[in-house]
Amino acid sequence: MQFEDQPVVLIAGPTASGKSALALAIAHEFAGQVINADAMQVYDVLQVLSARPSVPDMQGLPHVLYGHVPPAEAYSVAGWVKDIRKILAQQGPMPVIVGGTGLYFMAAEQGLAEVPEPDPAIRAHYRQRSAESLYEELLKRDAAEAERLRPSDTQRLSRALEVLESTGRSLGDFQREAHAHALLKGRRVIRIYLEPPRDQLYSRINMRFSQMLTQGGMEEAQELLKLGLDPQLPAMKAIGVPELASYFAGNMRLEEVENAAQQATRHYAKRQMTWARRNMIAWEFHIAQFSESISREIFAFIRNKG
């Protein structure tokens, strides 16, 4: 497949949904490269607890943006966009971007607006007001932006007014500029969303964390905690790390750690699914599980679109 005809495949879904297996199948079929879009799998110390693919899991295929960030760094969506832009510029194998961090996919397709930080006094002024008064003011000052937002969405209404007051420009202006220079602008994009039935997903989640505890997760957390890092860093908040920190401090039993981390993972998966229903409804494929028949359909679609 020539580069100019090469599509970009996006695979999203909640944690433990089987995304990696689908990404591998597509990468094998099209001699592609698998690119990480999971905010925790970027950290070098989080192999087990982030469910990052191991070397055998990678099956000899190129995998990039996995385990390349030290835990002392607060990796951001902006850093991910910068890194992946460099990868795509190399015009290498077909990109198969896979992960559960919805904001990464949104930034790749819609761009990442570089909005100046609002003045703290302006922010404080708007954040103490009601949604009704915020909406009324925004409707008068920036009707187009107001019509895009729910009248009850206090946070977004406040944000729009903070930016308008601080910069003199509509938040929509910044977002339109970002969209014009979005990472995947002008590329052929194929989007696949994978979401198993909830009972199956939760069963997988529970089983997976139990396996993590016996397959190196405890030792991994212990080594991370020895670094003495700020507990507010993203890597320190990875599911399993705070719970195991409590265990090592003598504040939780291992059974409690397991239950708490499983519950936290289920809640995280639920948030991912809620986010996807709002933002990924137009994706070409919505599938419940990876199967041979589904893979054939996806392969044919990629060939036809590619």
PLM features per residue range, with description:
Residues 1-306:
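Phosphate/pyrophosphate-binding catalytic cores of soluble transferases and nucleic-acid-acting enzymes
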